[in-house]
Amino acid sequence: MTPPAAARTADAPVDAADAGPAVRPASPVAARVLAAAARLFYSDGIRAVSADRVIAAAEVSKVTFYRHFPTKDALVVAWLSAVAAAERAALDAVRAAHPGDAGAVLRGYAEGLGTESCRPGFRGCPFINAAAEYADPDHPVRAVVAEHRRWMVGTAATLLADLGLDDPVGAAEELVVLRDGAMVAGYVGGPERAAAVAATLRHAGAAVVAAHRAPGTPRTA
């Protein structure tokens, strides 16, 4: 389940300190390349941005670029991995702010996503965008996308299980569908649709939770 902060990490430079140990660039130069790629890939699209354009934006030589990222696809994988790590860290922070209150985490997520997905500069979910540009489901880029989607469903299922739902995984999959739709609606609708996107996500999410609530389970979200 992607926290609202993911929208900010998607089109802003990815700070190496936010990327997590598994994807932290090996050097400041690699971090600069990754930051330049993050801005360009998200704003203009992956296929539309050449390696030469990233090299120019990062102000590095071709030799330096390819030393850190042997191919453009390797750079795309590194970028998406950094975004995924930042999103997971952001959700960890939200959960830490509401210990033991899964309902509060879900409600806060709905409100935050409505705001973030409608702000100027938002270009949709970077993982959905990447999947649209890489048709081969076996491509390494699609593998990163698939892993992040599994994480979203698993995280949402954990929160929903805490609410006593009889099918938390099924409910989680439905919430992720709502999340995807909200991000598209926010991108197309713009800032003036923020309240509507948040309200729709909140109300539809509550309906999903209600539909999967085990009989006799107290209403907490």
Regions found by a protein language model. Give the residues of each.
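N-terminal intrinsically disordered/low-complexity leader segments
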Residues: M1-P28, R213-A221
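Amphipathic alpha-helical packing segments from all-alpha helical-bundle domains
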Residues: R88, A104-R107, P137-D162, E173, ...
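Amphipathic alpha-helical segments used for helix-helix packing
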Residues: S117-P140
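Secondary-structure edge/capping motif, primarily at the C-terminal ends of alpha-helices
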Residues: H98, Y134, G186-G190
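Generic hydrophobic, amphipathic alpha-helix propensity
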Residues: V29-A37, V54, W79-V83, E87, ...
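Helix-turn-helix
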Residues: T2, R32, R39-A74, A78
